[in-house]
Curated annotation (Swiss-Prot):
Encoding gene, per UniProt annotation: glgA
Cited Gene3D superfamilies: Glycogen Phosphorylase B
Organism ancestry: Bacteria, Bacillati, Bacillota, Bacilli, Lactobacillales
Domain of life, source organism: Bacteria
A Gene Ontology biological process term: glycogen biosynthetic process
InterPro entries: Glyco_trans_1 (IPR001296), GS/SS (IPR011835), Starch_synth_cat_dom (IPR013534)
Pathway(s): Glycan biosynthesis; glycogen biosynthesis
Protein's name in the database: Glycogen synthase
Length: 479
């Protein structure tokens, strides 16, 4: 049986800040279901971990990890959830904080984590066939295996797979860290290694040293090889394209199922969509909007420019003046964008609700209650929200990039095919035009709309497909 150790900086259900947390929960479970023994290693953030899981933790061992001149305590705890065994790396100095990221010493924190992962394998006698790494927090591990731990015989056959969930975050530090944190020489500090504009780039090191690299959608894998999306690593990615692929993320089809979702006022399915309207009325009442059967548009997102919130704001004013619609926005993020959304709520109190908060239950109610889901991201490695919206029969409007292009089939008025709407030209007027098209179709052609809902709801976005592609990647490396 293939053995995989899945290393990440976060994992639901313990803690998550975004899509990485969802993937770190769902993909290991899906790999297990495919017959691949998969264990997960993450940091132990005691302040974030729910008590029910804290109480299940069992100590395994402890040792010290040399971070520069400092011998740092490293405790290993374990628990099993949904048939997946998790190892948690414990060091209060580094991980006993209120948040997960964004600290001045993140370099030291995740240098420690990566060395702890490498040393833990021998300490607990779990030597995987595949080390599945995720984003910059674990991207330097292939470099460490080649330069620091090369003498450990048991590690020689380990293959490394690096998954890039978002190329924007790379782990870029002063070259001094090679010695001051990792205690390795400067042999890798070259263009073909880890050097990046007079800095050390962990993600670049991972791309160059890993046995395989993938991103979380086929389109994003192509896009990041261009200057427009490559975040200054497009040349490195083109040089490594022989080992680069795109594997689409999935969603938990059981968890996000309108037929069984306990957060909803009324459950419904692709066969019986009528109760969906009850969810709309309940949400309108809850949020203080007029209870009317009008088109409800929704955003559930981090409020950032990457997610296209600035584009949406620029498109909104004429749209709201001319159209009898309601808009519900749920999320937190850039304070300037939060303020702008609140301003719209003040200007259009009968039409706009800006819920500046993080609330998963409310999010699921919004997916169920709304008619149109807005996701005009500037770039989108994969995106999960558009898949959730479709599964709830809420048709997405997306910018045709990355995973949005791979998951949403644009409506074709001639054939009736489609699961949503998309636009290419990233302009407020273009977004506004497609919003008007969607709202008009909803109002004037209810039978066409219902057919699109049915097509969206019956798409299979389950993790099984993704897990099979990861399995194929692993098998290819192990030949």
């Amino acid at each position: 049986m293939t053995r995989v150790l899945f290393a990440a900086a976060e994992a639901a259900p313990f803690y998550k800040t975004g899509g990485l947390g969802d993937v770190s929960m769902a993909l290991p479970r899906a790999l297990q279901a495919e017959g691949i023994e998969t264990r997960v290693v993450i940091p132990y953030y005691p302040h974030q971990m729910p008590t029910e899981y804290q109480q299940q933790l069992v100590p395994v061992t402890h040792f010290t990890v040399q971070v520069g001149e400092h011998a740092m305590y490293c405790g290993i705890k374990t628990l099993t959830v949904a048939h997946v065994q998790y190892y948690l790396i414990d060091n209060l100095d580094y991980f006993g904080r209120e948040g997960l990221y964004g600290y001045w010493d993140d370099g030291a924190r995740f240098a420690f984590f990566q060395m702890a992962v490498c040393e833990m394998m021998e300490q607990i006698d779990y030597i995987p066939d595949i080390l599945q790494l995720n984003d910059w927090h674990t991207a330097f591990i292939p470099v460490l295996l080649a330069e620091k731990y090369y003498w450990i015989e048991a590690y020689r056959d380990i293959k490394t797979v690096l998954t890039i969930h978002n190329l924007q975050f790379q782990g870029v530090y002063d070259p001094i860290i090679l010695d001051s944190l990792f205690r390795i020489g400067t042999e890798t500090y070259t263009e073909a290694g880890v050097a990046f504009y007079d800095q050390v780039n962990w993600l670049k090191g991972g791309i160059n040293f890993a046995d395989a690299v993938n991103t979380v959608s086929p389109t994003y894998a192509q896009e990041i090889q261009t200057p427009a999306f490559g975040e200054r690593l497009d040349g490195v990615l083109r040089a490594n394209r022989y080992k680069l692929s795109g594997i689409l993320n999935g969603i938990d089809m059981q968890l996000y199922d309108p037929a069984t979702d306990l957060a909803l006022t009324a459950n419904y399915s692709a066969k019986d969509l009528k109760p969906k309207r009850q969810n709309k009325r309940a949400l309108q009442r809850r949020l203080g909007l007029p209870v009317k059967n009008m088109p409800v548009l929704a955003v559930v997102s981090r409020l950032t420019k990457q997610k296209g919130i600035d584009l949406l704001l620029d498109a909104l004013n004429p749209f709201l003046q001319q159209q009898d619609v309601q808009l519900i926005v749920l999320g937190t993020g850039d304070p300037a964008l939060e303020r702008a959304l609140r301003t719209y709520q003040s200007a259009y109190p009968q039409k706009v609700v800006a819920a500046i908060q993080f609330d998963t239950q409310l999010a699921q109610q919004i997916y169920a209650a709304s008619d149109i889901f807005l996701m005009p991201s500037a770039f989108e490695p994969c995106g999960l929200s558009q898949m959730m919206a479709m599964h709830y029969g809420t048709l997405p409007i997306v910018h045709a990039v990355g995973g949005l292009r791979d998951t949403v089939i644009p409506y074709n008025r001639y054939t009736g095919q489609g699961t949503g709407f998309s636009f290419d030209d990233y302009q407020p007027a273009v977004l506004r035009k497609i919003m008007i098209l969607a709202v008009t179709l909803y109002r004037q052609h209810p039978l066409v709309w219902r057919q699109l809902q049915h097509q969206a709801m019956t798409c299979d976005f389950g993790w099984e497909h993704s897990a099979q592609q990861y399995r194929a990647t692993y098998q290819k490396l192990m030949r």
